[in-house]
């Protein structure tokens, strides 16, 4: 039951183009004054910068 729910949720988010990808420093672009107020800016949007896995 839980697996079916998780699968349906993932399929729903993917079909809505809501996919969360970790942001690394290679993806960051220069910020404009009217860009998002938190995190860093990428060509796809903005979010928190992820550090290297330890």
UniProtKB/Swiss-Prot annotation:
What follows loss of this gene? Impairs pathogenicity. Exhibits a defect in appressorium-mediated penetration in rice leaf sheath cells but neither in conidial germination nor appressorium formation.
Q: Where does the protein principally reside? A: secreted
Q: Where is the signal peptide?
A: 1-16
Give the organism, scientific name: Pyricularia oryzae (strain 70-15 / ATCC MYA-4617 / FGSC 8958) (Rice blast fungus)
What this protein is called in its record is Secreted virulence factor MC69
Q: Is-annotated flag, keyword Signal?
A: yes
Q: Supply the induction statement.
A: Expressed in conidia an all stages of infection.
Keywords attached to this Swiss-Prot or TrEMBL record, sorted alphabetically, are:
Disulfide bond, Secreted, Signal, Virulence
Q: What does this protein do?
A: Secreted protein required for appressorial penetration of intact host epidermal cells and for pathogenicity.
Question: Impact of mutating residue 46 to A?
Answer: Significantly reduces appressorial penetration rate and blast symptoms on barley and rice
Q: List the disulfide bonds.
A: 36-46
């Amino acid at each position: 039951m839980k697996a079916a729910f998780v699968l349906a949720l993932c399929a729903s988010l993917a079909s809505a183009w809501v996919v969360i990808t970790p942001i690394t420093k290679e993806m960051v672009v220069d910020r404009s004054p009217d860009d998002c107020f938190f995190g860093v800016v990428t060509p796809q949007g903005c979010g928190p910068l992820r550090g290297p896995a330890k």
